[in-house]
Each structure stands twice: as C-alpha cells, then as structure tokens.
C-alpha cells in the first residue's frame, strides 16, 4: 500500500509542476485543469489496492481458461495431424500467422525525424512544445513531421499532375503571414527554409484487388528546367485495391519558406493499361513528410541513416508479397569536361559614379566592367559570343583568362586550336553545296534492246569515285564520314514509253553472285520508271552496323552499286538512252540496321521483290496472286536465291504483322488501269471477280508524275499466323498460306500498244510477331513470279543422317568419311568454315561425300555481311557399327583457328576417342572492328574467319560427321551479301544443294 501512495505523490507533484508552467506562460484554463483532475482520479481508482484485490481472482480464472483453450487447440492439432497427415509445425505456423495478422497493421514507412536529424533538444523545450499553438513560428534546427497531408486524386483517362505539399497550408499561412506588419521576434532564430529529408506517398486505390492495372509516378522538382536535374525518381507499382502502395522519396533538398513552396515538388502519374471508367478516380494520394527548419544561425545535423542510406538510395518502394514494385532514381553528376566546354565567367565593376567633367559640370558615368573567365580548351561560351562589338573592344584590355591548373601545359604549335581548324577539316564536306559535295559523276547507257534482266551497271562503288570533282579529293583524304550517301539519277525519256529499273546498294558480294531484281533489292534499293519520274534521288547508309565509313571502306569491303532492268521498254526507242548520275555526301545522319535472329524486331525491313504483274489491255477480268511465305527462296522458274531478310524471317516458324507494299508503274504513263489489292487464301481462286471484290480491298491507282502507290494490310486481314516456309511437296491448295491478290477492277486501255506492268515490293512488316524456332525445310518452295513453285523445281539436299537432340539447333553439314588405305596413311582431314559455311577436304584419291544442309541458319551465315556475338556448334560422330568396341581405335580432333594457314595458332582444341558415337560442343565469339561486327575475310582491317580443322585417326572405323549450329542470344547480323543462285534439282543430276568439291 505504501508503494501505491508514493506513486500517487509523484503523479500529483508532476501535475502541479505542469500547472505552474501553464500559469507562467499565460495558458492557464480552469476547464483544462478540471479535465486533467478527472483523468488523474480515474488512474488512481484503477491502481488502488481494493480494486486489485477484487479483480485478482478473476484474472487467475481467465489465465486458467486460456491455458485450457491452448490444451484444446493442441489436441485438435494432434487429431488433425493423425487424420490428415499434416505436419504439426505447419498448423502452428498458420495459427501464429493468423494471430499476428489480427494484431498487426500496416504502418507508415517514413522514418521519423529523429532517424534523419540528430539536432539536440532539451527537456524544457520538449515540454514547452506541447503547449505551443499551431500558429507558432518554425525555428532553425527544429524537426517537424507531418502525416497524411492530402495530395489529390489520380483520375483515370486524364493527364494527372499533382503538387506534393511540404507542410499543411494552415501552418504555411501562419509562418508566412500576408501582412507586412506582423510582429516578429528573434529574427535570427526564425527558419528561412526547410530541409526536406523524406516524403512518403501513399496511394489508396479504388480498383479491384484482382486487377492487373499497373502505373507509376515521377517525382519532379519543378524549379529545375533541365529534365536531367528535374526528374528525381520514378516508381512503378500495381494499382490494385487492398494494401496501399507506398513509395519513399528522399529529396535531401532545401526549400525556401514562402508562398507557393508547396508547388515545387510535383508527381506526374500515369497508368499503362488502365481500364477504369474515364473521369473516375483510380486512387487518392496522401503524403507524409519529415523536415527540419534552417535559420541564419542553425541548420540541420544528419544522422548516420541519412548519410549512408537516404542520400545513397534517393528513393525506396515498399514491396508487398505478390505485388510488383520497382523504383529508379537519377543523378546528374558534374564532369570536368563541362567546365572545359561551357566555361565560367565572373563580371565585376560597372558601378555608376558621379564624375566631374568640368567646372560645375557633373554627369553620371558607369565604370568599365571586368570579366574573369575560367575555361579549358573548349569552345567559347554563348555569353561571350553575344557581347556587342563596342563592349568587346572595351573588354579587350580588361579581360583575364584563368585556366585550371591541370590544363596549364606547354603545347606545340600544331596543337593550337587555330592550326587544328585549318588542318583537321573533316566535317566541312557535308556542310557545302551539292556542287562542292559531289564526289562522283558519269553516265550509264541503257540499250534500246534492253529486256528484263539486262544489267546496266554492276560494280564496286569505289571504282566510281572521281578524282577531279570538287568534293572528290577531300572525300578521298577524309578519315571518317558519318552521314549518308546520296545518288541522283536523271534521264528524259518520252512518256509514250516506259522502262522499269532497279537501283540497289549492297555491302558485299560473293565471287559468283547473281545480279537481278531479287538479289540487289535486299539491303538498300529503289524501283524507278524514268517515264513517270525524270529525276531520282536515292540515299543509303554505307555502313549498316557502324557510325563511320570512308573511301578506304569502299575499296576494301567491296560495297557494290547495281542497276538492272526489271521491265522492258513499253515502246522501243529509236536509239540508246543514257542515265546521268552523280554521287554526293549527304548531310543526313546514317541509320544502322542490326538484327538479332533470336529476338524479332518490331519492324522487319524485308525489302523483298515480289515480282511483276502483267495485265493485258482489254476489259477482261485478270487476277494475279503472290504468296506471303517470305522465308522461302525467291526467284523465278529458272533461278532462285536467298537473301539476308529472307533468311532472317525463316528463322521463325510462323509470322504475322502489318505488311506494307509498294506498287510501282513500270509501263508507259499512257497505259492506264485501276487495280484492287486484297488478301485471300489459295483455294479462293474458284470465286468469280464479283465474289473476290467482297474481300476488304484497297484500290490502287497511279498518277502520271510519280507512278507509285502504297498499300498496307494489318493483322485484321489474317485469321492467324502462317508458316514462313512451305514445302514444295504440299499442293498449293493445302499450304494454308495467304496470298496477295491483285485484280483489274475495270479495264486496261491506252492509245498505244503495250502491257500494263506493275512492280510489287514488300517494304517492311510492322508489328512483326513471329513465333517458334524453325530448323528449316530440306524441300523448300521457291517463289516464282505470279505463282508458287511447283514440285518439279523443289530443292533437294543430301539425306539427313541424324537429328538434333533438341529443336533449337539448325543442321549445318553432313560428311561421309571415306575408306582409306591404312597401310599408306592412317588419318583423314577436312576443314569447315564456321562463319561463311563451306567445306573443303583433301581428296587425294578418296571418295568424300559431304553437303551443306539448306537450313535457315546456314543461309543467314551465307547472306549476312557483318556478324557479331556467339555461335554454338555441335558435332555428332557416328562410327561404323561392325567395329567391335574392344577393337575401336578411331579418334577425332577439332582445331579451331582464325584462318587455314599454319601460322595461325589454335583458339580451341577438342579431342575425343569414344567408341562408336560421341558428341562435341564448343562455341566461338565473333568480335570485329566495326562496332563489334566482323566481315568475313575482308581486307579492311585484315578481318579473318573462323575455321574448324578436323583430323580423323583411323578413318576406316569412322562413319558420319553431322554438324549443327545455333545462334547465341547476343548474335547479330547486318548488311546483305549477294550470293550465287541455288542449284535446282534435275539440272545436273546430282540432287544436292549446293555441293562443294
């Protein structure tokens, strides 16, 4: 009982002391005194001995009952464990989690002011702060925290930008009064600004807890104009109901206390897939803020948490189980190069003084100002460039230049900026006129007897560069060019005739390449009818995967310009015609075209020549069709070729997207007609013209000047995706491949003779969505003009001996090891080029049988010019089954090197002697000098290849070597390589494609 009396005396003493403090401060109130007396009386009643003596027996009974309930729970757990075989600890964990979920709740995650600032605070100030009114003045060094300040609502379907308040508006109005007559005491202690240490954004979402809506907010400091400095952090989270998403920002920023300070920080909100009703609120936001006042004589003292975590992280998102959350922040660090580039100027002087000019003559005059500049060897600042001529003359004698210490070095005369501008003139070529930027010019002859397939020009681009033109010497002696190359062609032919020309640029060609409209159109090309367009301008990016090129780049890489006739003269001219051409260095920056066969691009620039559509003059119905299996070989009934875009598309099984076509009129402008273009299947050819026009179609008409029309067919024109390659063994009606149909709508008529010819080119596929890895078809359908390839022109290869273990490998080649006379030589060897697939063997009387498998990956390696990244290879070795395991002595060794010469050392060596069957895996990393890309055996930079030299010991026991290849995730290609045509079966009786001997 004595302990209770002592505690009561202490409580009454503290209460009396607080009452005296209130009287001293003038805040004493009888109503407050009465309420506090009631509270103390209630506490005394609870702690009295009489009440405890009455409640003690009940407390004991409740504890016993609780213990009994625990025993019952344990019995139920044992029973459930016995009946359902559930471990007891699982049920215990569930019970504990349930009890914890009942007792705990999600709290604010913002750190307290004490965690951010360690500003000292006395006991008297803590007691005194309890009795300060809300309108008190914020002082320097005072730590403040505000919870649940309203921010605003995130409205669906609208651009949402909300201001993040730093403190409530009512307190801001008290700190910054509207009247200038407000009485302010102790001015030095009044806070002039606040340091915002932490801001927590809480989003109360109105959406369903099971929705998939996501969104985010960007925390912006609007006092900065540069986005690099303004955007402080960004967070992304799921906007679904239930637990409120929270994000912590640590601005670490001082904000001046004034009107409008709550408008400085803003949240820019966005939702990527919101299906909420427009105009309704997705969520409403509130903010928790922790800050510290800063005055003239007191600042803030950060804690270790603030220094080590808050300043380092800048932002932190609260992650909940089953919810995606992410946050990023940005820092714009200062770099010494900025001082070199922009400099720093200090101006002083220029004060106005009263100067005596003569007796009783005075005038106001401004003294000369001086400038001190801190800069390196960079360009002059914009401020110095805008100074007027008069001011510049005045400052000539008063300007002082201060260089940083590390830049004060003695420079040779040739390193001075003036000499550099005179000698290092690498950028002036592209800034001149067309006359001064012309580097080549000449004439090409088009014979009057030109027919389809006539090659007007096909040669190296370096051979066209002149020596006497104004821009040619400068171009030849410039190390780097970073802009496009522009071709200008002019010809004036009568409009009563017409001819179709194709101009193409390709990065490189093989020795026995084919020059026609199918091969030269794959990289950079344009279709031209001089009768419709007298002047043609054509720009290309010479380096498809790098930023620079030069004259030596043309000479040593084999860049090629080709011009061929794709449609003959509509009316034969009386003489040969000449095309005047000229080449200029353009001022447009280059664009790179890099492709990854494992990751489909959003836009695939196919640039595939679909063929010529020939319509006879008359009123009869005429229907033409072209298949859209763009991964197959392209050509006509005589030749077929593969190009880099075709090989890239063939890497996937199925495709769908928006197909963009270009229609070019190739005949005379006098021959006119209206065409309909639409998508349909092959079995729809039995429909009448009236039924065919019921398909969603596009009208194609040409004007007399341009002669071009563009047509697009989106995904809505296709029921589903279709195969990129179609087997020639499948009949046309069962291929399931959509066709581009072109139908004459009315009539084809003219006052002159001739057919109405239209060229069709597939430019690109937008929203390209392929799926599935395609190992390839041994029998691939060849696309023939106006029809699909028949079975008689199918492509055959040597029979496949084995298949890959998983469907991510492409077959490379197969070799049948010959039988040798072991008394003379006990080994056999062959070489395989891994980058440009070719096989070479030491015949010397041996019957080698080997073939390259026409898989999409092999075609991609052959037709792509530049390559970089990893390639994975697999060799399956199959021995002869009639050799006993105990008698097996055959070995296989693979030496991978950069070139076939003996002076090149091995990069990879693999050896095996396993009997009967084995598998060898290895990989190579292609890395070249052109932005990481490498060209096969190019003189430019002495670029090489990757060769695999295989030596077989005791080859009589060896049977078959089967090679496979697979691209790595970082493998990329660029540029088209014009290759030789594919060998069609039945012409030489070999039945192989192609065979290298």
From Swiss-Prot:
The record marks 430 as: Interaction with the viral RNA. Residues 370-376 are annotated as: Involved in tubule formation by the movement protein. The keyword Repeat does not apply. GO terms for cellular component: host cell plasmodesma; T=3 icosahedral viral capsid. It comes from the Viruses. The record marks 413-414, 800-801 as: Cleavage. GO terms for biological process: symbiont-mediated suppression of host innate immune response; transport of virus in host, cell to cell. One of its GO terms (molecular function) is GTP binding. Keywords: Capsid protein, DNA-binding, GTP-binding, Host cell junction, Host-virus interaction, Inhibition of host innate immune response by virus, Nucleotide-binding, RNA-binding, Suppressor of RNA silencing, T=3 icosahedral capsid protein, Transport, Viral immunoevasion, Viral movement protein, Virion. The lineage of its organism: Viruses, Riboviria, Orthornavirae, Pisuviricota, Pisoniviricetes. This is RNA2 polyprotein. Pfam families: Como_LCP, Como_SCP. SUPFAM superfamilies: Positive stranded ssRNA viruses.
